[in-house]
Amino acid sequence: GADCVVKQEDAEWDERAVRIYHNAKPGENYCPAGEDFSAGDLLAEAGTPVDSYLLAAVTAAGVRNLTVYKRLKAAVITTGDELQNTETPLQPGKIYDANGIWLCTRLREMDCEVVRYQTAGDDQSKIADEIREAWKEADLILTTGGVSVGEKDLLPGVIENLTGNVLFHGIQVKPGMPTMLSMVKGTPVLSLSGN
């Protein structure tokens, strides 16, 4: 029949009596069942990243098993002889590889693990080698540049030589019309325009 709880530090007791040194109020220091959540409450939406708070909540609720998905592992391969990293002063006729840096950063912001980031220039065999290396560890490969119809747009030929299956090549959006999606050895390769 109690309606409150008195903290131990606010009382003294022995075998015969308890002495309380302040006026206790109804509901004081009392946590009703279901205070954190009730039966049937949604603890997390599908797709919520699992962190220490979520694990504590589901443990408190008695949840023993969760269906989870691993973090997506992505590889980024940029193409173009004009690309240069930012570690050296910009050379004439070159540009810094801003697309590669942006893609890697954006993927990490979306909780993906970037397992590989390489620049392959305009070299068909190097691009193919980079894709071969990437599919060993990545769930998704993103490429930039070399996907249109110019002399140095090598990606369509590289994908064909790797016996890739092109799912589409070209979308109705500007910029980015030559975007291509293909499957190579079971790994999706999303090829984006370099511009």
Place the predicted regions along the sequence by residue:
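Short, glycine/charged-enriched hinge/interface segments at domain edges or termini
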Residues: 1-116
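Short glycine/threonine-rich loop/turn motifs
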Residues: 94, 100, 111-194
